[in-house]
């Protein structure tokens, strides 16, 4: 577990003869530091983008926000701790699409319905990459799809570990395009996938743009298509989405801020306003787009409907793959 103080923001005490404890009690929330639990390791994609959000929230609320990294179990360890925290607003946390896959895999009984949502701030999207070293080389996604259809089971596709978010993306791509491939799942969330493709051990792979960017720029892999709802930010905005080519394929991982259930309404309102203002900061928008994600703010009311739709698609994919073990 890593604990890092993002920023220290002072809060003034009431003047006069009132003692420190009385002054703190008289202040509106927050009157002490807030903990933000993040279910991935420090430096991971999700961690990198939640930190500047919390830095801005800290400045807006006048209290430090302490990031506590608790990776493991597909982020389920962190989710359990957030859910079980005292609902006073002093423990909040990070969430992603793994909150859907965890329950469907039987890893955790919790899902996104079991938390207080405070706003979503960015969306990670997977891409399809092709090796420049393998025997089968492709310049476009259409070439890769055509080859897979003409040679069932011959295209080697590297994916994230079974059940991981980018594995779900790969299954969505395979099913949506109607191809038959030889999948090669790799440990973790996608870094090994890129290494396999770059080394010529797989023809194509599905990974995050952030994980593949250096290999794309170095020429070891080619960026063929995006599996998200929209195209990647510049300079990759000329690369098509698979959906715009006529295939019903889409998968994204939205990151959001949440807290335990049953938080006081006034505390929720304070946090929601701070998260929204932090996320809409022009400098944060620029940072998000430069970090190979798509910036977007989704208010709390929009998170559950969006995840309900995505959950239905994931459930079908996992059922077909024989790994549906929905926790009760």
What are these regions (language model features)?
Residues 1-31, 325-328:
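Short, low-complexity disordered leader/linker segments with a strong preference
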Residues 24-114, 154, 177-206, 215, ...:
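N-terminal (or domain-start) structured segment
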Residues 41-43, 97, 132-137, 160-164, ...:
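Short coil/turn segments
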Residues 44, 48, 73, 164, ...:
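Soluble non-cytosolic domains of exported or imported proteins
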Residues 59, 81-90, 103-192, 242, ...:
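Hinge/capping helix and adjacent helix->loop/strand transition within the periplasmic-binding protein
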Residues 97-107, 167-176, 203-237:
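A ligand-binding cleft/hinge motif common to bilobed small-molecule-binding domains
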Residues 123, 211-280, 309-312, 317, ...:
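C-terminal lobe and pocket-closing loops
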Residues 269, 280, 285-306:
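Mature extracytoplasmic/periplasmic domains
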């Amino acid at each position: 577990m890593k604990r890092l103080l993002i920023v220290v923001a002072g809060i003034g005490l009431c003047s006069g003869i009132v003692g420190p404890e009385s002054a703190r009690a008289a202040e509106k929330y927050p009157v002490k530091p807030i903990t933000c639990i993040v279910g991935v390791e420090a430096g991971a994609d999700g961690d990198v983008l939640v930190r500047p959000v919390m830095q801005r929230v800290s400045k807006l609320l006048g209290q430090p926000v302490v990031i506590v990294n608790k990776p493991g179990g597909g982020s389920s360890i962190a989710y359990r701790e957030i859910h079980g925290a005292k609902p006073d607003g002093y423990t909040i946390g990070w969430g992603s699409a793994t909150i859907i896959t965890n329950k469907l895999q039987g890893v955790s009984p919790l899902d996104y319905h079991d938390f207080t949502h405070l706003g979503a701030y960015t969306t990670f999207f997977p891409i399809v990459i092709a090796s420049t070293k393998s025997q089968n080389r492709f310049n476009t996604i259409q070439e890769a799809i055509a080859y897979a259809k003409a040679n069932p089971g011959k295209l080697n596709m590297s994916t994230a570990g079974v059940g991981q978010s980018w594995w779900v993306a790969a299954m969505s791509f395979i099913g949506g395009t109607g191809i038959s491939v030889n999948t090669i799942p790799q440990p973790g969330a996608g870094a090994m996938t890129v290494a396999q493709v770059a080394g010529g051990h797989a023809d194509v792979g599905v990974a995050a743009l952030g994980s593949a960017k250096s290999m794309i720029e170095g020429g070891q892999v080619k960026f063929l298509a995006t599996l998200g709802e929209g195209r990647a930010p510049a300079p990759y905005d000329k690369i098509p989405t698979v959906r715009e080519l006529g295939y019903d394929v889409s998968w994204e991982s939205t990151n959001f801020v949440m807290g335990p259930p049953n938080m006081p309404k006034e505390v929720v309102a304070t946090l929601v306003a701070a998260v929204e203002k932090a996320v809409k900061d022009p400098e944060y928008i620029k940072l998000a787009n430069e970090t190979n994600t798509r910036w977007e703010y989704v208010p709390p009311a929009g998170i559950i409907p969006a995840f309900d739709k995505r959950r239905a698609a994931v459930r079908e994919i996992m059922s077909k793959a024989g790994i549906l073990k929905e926790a009760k």
